[in-house]
Amino acid sequence: MRIKKVWAVYFSGTGTTEKTVRRIAAGMAQALDAELAVYDFTTPAARQRELRFGAEGLAVLGVPVYAGRVPNVLLPYLTKQLHGGGALAVPVVLFGNRNFDDGLIELRNILTEDGFMPVAGGAFVGEHAFSRTLGAGRPNGDDLAEMDAFARRAAEKVTALTAAPAEPVAVWGETPIRPYYTPRDRHGNPINILKVKPKTDMDRCGGCGLCAARCPMGSIDPADVSQVTGICIKCCACVKGCPAEAKYFDDAGYLYHKSELEEVYACPAANEVFL
């Protein structure tokens, strides 16, 4: 098939999904001799815009995995604002060294329902949003090499097609999609961190406003960054993006869950690709 434009489309709180999607899309665009376009829908304003694709396009679309699934706050955008129009797609998910569970198959199914035809898919490891040690430094050089190889193989598959496939690419995951992963304490009791919000050390804060500008939910008050006026999805864009390290979480359940993840899933996880 002749593809004229390859899109890199992504939500990325801390930058790992952006790095991965842009790398794969750039590799595919080069291999397919196609134009490269980029759309970042991380901010609330960006999620107001509809994106329409066509039969001569291909979208590498990526999101992070939250609790083993596509983040539920992204579902309205993914299901209503994207229109595939027969374009090919490569769904990509980033997971923080635990597991991508049903995140990839859920994203594949969403894109199929949006009018795309997924022809390849990948689940890649990125440093966990909660942690600086879990999946530390990933994607690293080896991961980038795997992304490049995946991009080449996916492009070769597309080039060999005479028409769009009748069925989307088979990927790992269960149908029906399983519930969101629930963290538990040492006694097996569920830990609910849905309403947990970050704190701000105002003695450290320099008032730059980056946290408010980068919050994907627009929940941090730019006039007083210590105030989180909307929902927090624990993407940690504010924590990891603060140059003064003034943002932090101190909720006991959150910290227990973070510590447990770092202990149980310390062994580096592998990327998985599907063609």
Role assignments for model-derived ranges:
Residues 200-201, 206-233, 237-255:
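Iron-sulfur cluster-binding cysteine motifs and their immediate structural context
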Residues 176-217:
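Acidic, Ser/Thr-rich low-complexity intrinsically disordered segments
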Residues 1-19, 23-43, 49-191, 250-275:
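FMN-binding flavodoxin-like domain, especially the glycine-rich phosphate-binding loop
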